[in-house]
């Protein structure tokens, strides 16, 4: 670890920046080395130890340890292509309690993406931005009319950064994410409580409506700022939609309420997390795993898995096959081909048989003349 950072070599120059590590993350099966031998090596070198050792468990598949020999390994590249890396990262970190094993399930993953990301976060952003565009042409007026009902949402938002900090310091990432989504759920509830669609019908309630929508935009800003370390690709898209300039998206501002300009301008964008067809996706993902497991089973038994859709013959059919030997009389390369050889072979019939085969990479024509083949 420290050599790669530049310790006692001139190739790298990051040792002073990154060592000692604030958190050293390791898997539970290598804890003994990192908790005993590695610290002893550092002490012998008179170097500081990592400040905290975080040990994570294994991710199992439906309760079973993932194994290449079994074929039940979930391919993260396949999942990333289908649902996006942010969604997969969120699901794993939300499901996994550090220090314990976590069971991965395609069904639980897809349902969580739909419920947390598409329904809760995605709909909150979409509804809020859509209402600002519908009632104010995309730009909120500066007039405000606060009400008592606003205070619970505002106080919940203001308390969020401290709560997430506490969980992150304990490397309880799942609990930090749970706290952030409590605020997102509270913001969705606030929409139902304040009924902005009713306020929008009354011209005298425009200032009140602007206040409600501004509070929602601020709740989105704070929660997505804290989510950005978990979902770094998607959150900038949210900030663009809610009119949050990059300079406003800071850790310090995540502890404040009222950072967005009063006359903020929003810009509706595509759905952040489109809903997934659960049944269709589960069938396709299970089919992939099933295919992997069949191939692994065949490999373990020394057999090659038969291509899907191609029937295999039985021993009775094989017994009907007539095998003949033939002596190669002539052999020459096929013109304009790098692989093919044309062979004239005597199999005991009236005249030689012509055979074309792709073996020129392995045999020279003159090496085959006189050979007997089946």
Cite the ranges covered by each PLM segment.
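Short clusters of hydrophobic/aromatic residues that line enzyme substrate/ligand-binding pockets
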Residues: 18-19, 66, 104, 140, ...
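Basic, alpha-helical terminal appendages of large translation-related enzymes
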Residues: 166, 181, 185-374
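A glycine-rich phosphate-binding loop feature that marks nucleotide/adenosyl-phosphate handling sites
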Residues: 57-59, 108, 143-148, 181-182, ...
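Conserved, charged catalytic cores of large soluble enzymes
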Residues: 5-14, 99, 125-164, 184-205
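Secondary-structure capping and boundary motifs in well-ordered enzyme cores
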Residues: 25-30, 68, 79-80, 109-120, ...
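Structured secondary-structure scaffolds
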Residues: 1-134, 176-180
């Amino acid at each position: 670890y420290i050599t790669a950072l530049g310790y006692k070599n001139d190739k790298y120059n990051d040792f002073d920046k990154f060592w000692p590590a604030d958190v050293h993350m390791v898997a539970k099966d290598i804890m003994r080395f990192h908790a005993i031998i590695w610290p002893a090596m550092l002490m012998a070198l008179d170097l500081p130890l990592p400040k905290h050792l975080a040990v994570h468990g294994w991710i199992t598949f439906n309760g079973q340890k993932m194994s290449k020999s079994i074929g039940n390994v979930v391919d993260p590249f396949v999942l990333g292509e289908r649902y996006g890396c942010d969604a997969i990262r969120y699901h794993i970190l939300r499901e996994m309690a550090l220090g314990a094993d976590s069971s991965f399930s395609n069904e639980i993953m897809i349902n969580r993406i739909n419920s947390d990301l598409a329904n809760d976060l995605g709909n909150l952003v979409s509804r809020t931005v859509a209402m600002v565009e519908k009632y104010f042409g995309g730009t909120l007026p500066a007039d405000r009319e606060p009400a008592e009902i606003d205070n619970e949402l505002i106080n919940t938002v203001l308390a969020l950064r401290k709560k997430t900090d506490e969980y992150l310091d304990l490397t309880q990432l799942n609990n930090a994410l749970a706290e952030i989504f409590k605020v997102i759920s509270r913001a969705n509830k606030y929409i139902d409580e304040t009924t902005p669609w009713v306020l929008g019908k009354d011209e005298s309630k425009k200032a009140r409506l602007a206040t409600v929508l501004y509070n929602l935009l601020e709740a989105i800003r704070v929660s997505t700022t804290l989510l950005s370390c978990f979902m770094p690709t998607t959150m900038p898209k949210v900030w663009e939609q809610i009119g949050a300039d990059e300079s406003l998206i800071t850790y310090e501002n995540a502890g404040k309420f009222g950072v967005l300009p009063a006359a903020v301008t929003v810009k509706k964008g595509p759905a952040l997390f489109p809903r997934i067809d659960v049944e269709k996706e589960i069938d396709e993902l299970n089919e992939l795993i099933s295919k992997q497991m069949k191939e692994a089973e065949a490999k373990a038994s020394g057999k090659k898995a038969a291509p899907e859709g191609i029937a295999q013959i039985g021993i009775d059919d094989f017994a009907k096959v007539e095998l003949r030997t033939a002596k190669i009389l002539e052999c020459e390369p096929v013109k304009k081909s790098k692989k093919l050889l044309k062979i004239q072979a005597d199999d005991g019939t009236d005249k030689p048989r012509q055979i074309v085969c792709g073996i020129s990479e392995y045999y020279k024509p003159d090496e085959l003349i006189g050979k007997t083949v089946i």
